């Protein structure tokens, strides 16, 4: 029922777009009156050397790519749509920058289409067919962004030797925390800059006690998480002993 209603909506939109395109094209042809033959052109215009040098009137489609915001008509009315696996970082590292640039726009168009489909399904209060497609596209775009960032970092390290895109240094603030301080250009020297001098890149001696307490708290939280995961693993092994035995045999 959900897929059928979405299919009806998409068919109506496509029919409206086709009707508007045919109407505008007929109006432009009737108004311009560009129907003439090659023989008349050669007789009336002796200075023109060839017909290929003449540029006819061109009009863009009224749809302007709106059909790309909707799914393929073959998938209309289907409850499940087959889709491939998402792109991994290892696969994207083997591609050139030009291929990654093209793939980014392909994924962006696919994401816009799926978001349109998701919004229409929410409007009709119906389930979206194969919602995992949107998750795969998002994962692929995240992996592509990560690969591009890796290449930018490698190029920056080769040219300037800096790890961060913006130069800076590790400093200690007044609370005893180690932070990354980003450098910034100022029109006046640092010793005349009151705003910069208000920053304190040191900690008082009485802060060391609280730094130890913060480290102990972080260590307790980490140990609590590790013990919780171990308890979950033991519980699952007791509840599903056949799975644990199969895992041990596959590892051996």
From Swiss-Prot:
GO terms for molecular function: structural constituent of ribosome. Its main location: mitochondrion. GO terms for biological process: mitochondrial translation. InterPro entries: MRP-L47_sf, Ribosomal_uL29_mit. It is found in: Mitochondrion. The modification N6-acetyllysine is found at residue 146. Signal peptide: none annotated. Pfam families: MRP-L47. Keywords: Acetylation, Mitochondrion, Ribonucleoprotein, Ribosomal protein, Transit peptide. One of its GO terms (cellular component) is mitochondrial large ribosomal subunit. Disulfide bonds: none annotated. Belongs to the universal ribosomal protein uL29 family. PANTHER family: LARGE RIBOSOMAL SUBUNIT PROTEIN UL29M, RIBOSOMAL PROTEIN L47, MITOCHONDRIAL-RELATED. Component of the mitochondrial ribosome large subunit (39S) which comprises a 16S rRNA and about 50 distinct proteins. This is Large ribosomal subunit protein uL29m. The gene is MRPL47.
């Amino acid at each position: 029922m959900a897929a059928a209603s979405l299919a009806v909506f998409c068919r109506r939109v496509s029919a409206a777009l086709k009707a508007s395109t045919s109407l505008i094209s007929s109006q432009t042809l009737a108004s311009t009156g560009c129907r003439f033959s090659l023989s008349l052109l050669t007789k009336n215009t002796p200075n023109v050397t060839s017909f290929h040098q003449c540029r006819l009137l061109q009009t863009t489609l009224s749809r302007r790519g709106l059909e790309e915001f909707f799914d393929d008509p073959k998938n209309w009315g289907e409850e499940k749509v087959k889709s491939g696996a998402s792109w991994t970082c290892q696969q994207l590292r083997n591609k050139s920058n030009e291929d990654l640039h093209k793939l980014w726009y392909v994924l962006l168009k696919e994401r816009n289409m799926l978001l349109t489909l998701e919004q229409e399904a929410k409007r009709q209060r119906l389930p979206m067919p194969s919602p995992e497609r949107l998750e795969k596209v998002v994962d692929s775009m995240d992996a592509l962004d990560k690969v591009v960032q890796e290449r930018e970092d490698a190029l920056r390290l080769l040219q300037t030797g800096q790890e961060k895109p913006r130069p800076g240094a590790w400093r200690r603030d007044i609370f005893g925390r180690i932070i990354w301080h980003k450098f910034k250009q100022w029109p006046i020297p640092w010793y005349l800059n009151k705003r910069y001098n208000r920053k304190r890149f040191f900690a008082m001696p009485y802060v060391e006690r609280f730094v130890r307490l913060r480290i102990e708290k972080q260590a307790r939280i980490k140990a609590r998480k590790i013990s919780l995961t171990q308890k979950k693993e033991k519980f699952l092994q007791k509840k599903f002993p056949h799975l644990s035995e199969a895992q041990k045999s596959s590892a051996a």
